[in-house]
């Protein structure tokens, strides 16, 4: 039986967040504030990989008393590697919502089972349907 702690160290938390998959962006993360993103839908897969842009989501996970708040955004990941807060076309929106929902469920489960910490949506977070 694994030990559950609700006061994890930064490194223990990072290890669990990394194990969730390729979402965590270490260089943009710091203790108490973690950055995630997902390139859900390629805009034009005929372009060479280094020139591709994507529709997707990004999120800042901020530590709070007893848990975290998740502030999700949706938009376009451009060729320069920047997220742009743009409306996603309907033909890509379903997949973006699906990847975000799957990730969020995994995040909530990971933090609850390992650390007894909750995750709430930030008041400015994009709603996924």
UniProtKB/Swiss-Prot annotation:
Family membership: Belongs to the Crl family.
Listed NCBIfam families: PRK10984.1
Major location (coarse): cytoplasm
Region (Essential for activity): 99-119
Organism of this sequence: Vibrio vulnificus (strain YJ016)
Keywords per UniProt: Activator, Cytoplasm, Transcription, Transcription regulation
Keyword Cytoplasm on entry: yes
Protein name: Sigma factor-binding protein Crl
Alphabetized Gene3D superfamilies for the sequence: Sigma factor-binding protein Crl monomer
GO cellular component: cytoplasm
Keyword flag Signal: no
Function statement: Binds to the sigma-S subunit of RNA polymerase, activating expression of sigma-S-regulated genes. Stimulates RNA polymerase holoenzyme formation and may bind to several other sigma factors, such as sigma-70 and sigma-32.
Localization, UniProt: Cytoplasm
GO biological process: positive regulation of DNA-templated transcription
């Amino acid at each position: 039986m694994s030990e559950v702690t609700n006061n994890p160290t930064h490194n223990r938390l990072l290890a669990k967040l990394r194990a969730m998959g390729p979402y965590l962006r270490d260089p943009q993360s710091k203790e108490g504030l973690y950055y995630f993103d997902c390139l859900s839908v390629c805009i034009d897969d005929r372009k060479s990989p280094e020139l591709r842009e994507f529709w997707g989501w990004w999120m800042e996970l901020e530590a709070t008393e007893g848990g975290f708040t998740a502030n999700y955004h949706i938009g376009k990941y451009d060729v320069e590697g920047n997220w742009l807060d743009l409306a996603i076309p309907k033909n890509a929106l379903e997949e973006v919502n699906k990847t975000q929902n799957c990730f969020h469920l995994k995040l909530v489960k990971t933090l609850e089972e390992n650390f007894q910490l909750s995750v709430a949506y930030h008041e400015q977070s994009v709603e996924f349907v």
